């Protein structure tokens, strides 16, 4: 029996505040003005993409005590941008990254339920945790949460928010003008939740939204992150976009679903990838080389080098070999607020690996940094890129890709104009949206509302928590 042909899922990531974005390119626009977000989202919708994805950083990055300003600095609030985009798009899903460490479930649930209403059922939440006290200082929290507790809090945070989403069935609002009755159930929105992190009870004030809950994304790659995704997420944002790494990650995460009573098609694996398209493969390779040089300037190469070596290397030649001195090991780092620092736990071992690679391939410091810090990219003619993406999806290396252009807001256009039609011709990508909600686009089953029995029991628990007799 032949294997069914999979449909490809595509999404667009508005580039974040990192060196993927070539903000100095003459074609690059603002990362602050709404017109850039609107143009980017409308291009993704024109291409029939599943959703737009926004990352989020809660503190400006620093290096050697100064703002890291080689990349884009600053970004408008995620919810504000997504709510505005809901008004200028009709079908495109709207995915926002919201932190579970420095927020509260009630606030986040209200915001996502509201976004789901305003967008007609297109909201999604990428649940992330924060690992450093540096970010926590913005919230007067410092390092209040040990790193090994962050997923525990994230799990209970999500569970609490889901209980709030489910506190309405969806049929309570009757708006009976003749009899002056607005809701049919006096217990609508009642909730009570108590665990090691949250102790809340009351009434949730946003009625059930079109999807019931936002689609849940997760982006962690640790063992805890993979288990969290297998237990609770609808999709996972992955960095494993090559064939071997993608297949290994795909098999691992999909293989965990059964232990949580879930089927393999209930979680989508969506790696992020950049792309460079040319009329020919050779032209695309030339363009990609120029993009890589723009992404890893001499200054950027030195900054990345300093993050691993944890010492001032401002006098180092980026076109020369790697430093002969060893990295400085310790809790005090010269780079703060950058996720890549977490990858450098064993800095001496990584430095030795880098030296071996540089020597074997005759790479300068800058060339080495561009190789090891670059994101997986699809490079080639439209035909080559379309074939590569389809081959990876059909080989179960992914269920699709979250595409990250290096220029905004117009960097998505070449893919939409030249690659999407080829995928549509091959019958592996939609020609039109078939549904209206993000769950529809992702092929996820609708979420059933909680029964009257479940809601009544929760209302009684809430009354007991507040001392109200039932």
List each language-model region with its residue ranges.
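An alpha-helical appendage that flanks or caps ligand/catalytic pockets
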Residues: 2-16, 148-211, 244-247, 251, ...
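Acidic (Asp/Glu)-rich catalytic clusters
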Residues: 2-5, 45-46, 82-90, 116-122, ...
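N-terminal beta1-alpha1-beta2 module of alpha/beta enzyme domains
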Residues: 2-88, 211-214, 436, 453-458, ...
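Hydrophobic faces of well-ordered beta-strands that scaffold small-molecule active sites
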Residues: 8-12, 52-54, 92-96, 121-127, ...
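Conserved, mostly hydrophobic/aromatic
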Residues: 10, 44, 48, 85, ...
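Active-site mouth loops of central-metabolism enzymes
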Residues: 21-35, 97-106, 142-144, 148, ...
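Catalytic domains of carbohydrate-active enzymes, especially glycoside hydrolases
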Residues: 32-57, 228-238, 389-400
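Hydrophobic or amphipathic alpha-helical targeting/insertion segments
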Residues: 88-89, 93-141, 145, 153-157
């Amino acid at each position: 029996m032949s294997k069914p042909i999979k449909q490809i899922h595509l999404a667009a990531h508005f580039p974040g505040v990192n060196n993927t974005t070539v903000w100095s390119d003459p074609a690059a626009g603002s990362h602050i003005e709404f017109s850039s977000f609107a143009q980017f989202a409308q291009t993704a919708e024109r291409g029939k993409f599943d959703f737009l994805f926004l990352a989020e950083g809660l503190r400006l990055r620093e290096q050697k005590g100064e703002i890291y300003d080689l990349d884009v600095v600053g970004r408008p609030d995620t919810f504000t941008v997504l709510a505005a985009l809901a008004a200028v798009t009709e079908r495109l899903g709207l995915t926002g990254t919201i932190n579970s460490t420095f927020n509260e479930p009630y606030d986040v649930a209200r915001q996502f339920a509201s976004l789901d209403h305003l967008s007609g059922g297109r909201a999604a939440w990428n649940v992330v945790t924060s690992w450093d006290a540096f970010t926590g200082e913005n919230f007067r929290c410092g390092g209040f949460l040990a790193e090994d507790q962050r997923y525990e809090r994230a799990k209970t945070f999500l569970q609490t928010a889901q209980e709030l989403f489910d506190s309405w069935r969806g049929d309570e609002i009757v708006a009976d003008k003749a009899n002056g009755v607005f809701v049919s159930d006096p217990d609508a929105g009642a909730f009570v939740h108590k665990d090691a992190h949250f102790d809340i009870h009351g009434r949730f004030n946003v009625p059930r939204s079109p999807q019931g809950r936002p689609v849940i994304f997760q982006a962690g790659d640790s063992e805890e992150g993979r288990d969290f995704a297998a237990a609770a997420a609808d999709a996972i944002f992955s960095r494993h976009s090559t064939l071997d790494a993608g297949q290994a990650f795909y098999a691992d995460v999909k293989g965990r679903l059964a232990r949580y009573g879930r089927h393999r098609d209930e979680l989508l694996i969506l790696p992020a990838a950049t792309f460079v398209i040319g009329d020919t493969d050779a032209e695309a390779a030339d363009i990609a080389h120029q993009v890589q040089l723009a992404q890893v300037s001499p200054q950027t190469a030195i900054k990345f080098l300093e993050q691993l070596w944890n010492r001032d290397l401002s006098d180092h030649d980026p076109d020369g070999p790697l430093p002969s001195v060893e990295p400085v090991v310790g809790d005090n780092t010269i780079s703060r607020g950058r996720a890549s620092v977490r990858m450098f736990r064993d800095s001496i071992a990584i430095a030795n690996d880098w030296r071996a690679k540089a020597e074997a391939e005759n790479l300068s410091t800058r060339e080495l940094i561009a190789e090891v810090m670059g994101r997986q990219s699809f490079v080639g003619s439209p035909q080559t890129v379309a074939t590569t993406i389809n081959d990876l999806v059909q080989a179960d290396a992914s269920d699709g890709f979250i595409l990250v252009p290096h220029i905004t807001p117009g960097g998505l256009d070449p893919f939409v104009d030249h690659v999407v039609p080829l995928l549509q011709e091959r019958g592996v990508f939609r020609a039109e949206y078939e549904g209206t909600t993000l769950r529809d686009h992702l092929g996820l089953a609708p979420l059933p509302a909680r029964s009257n029995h479940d809601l009544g029991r929760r209302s009684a628990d809430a009354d007991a928590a507040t001392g109200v007799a039932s």
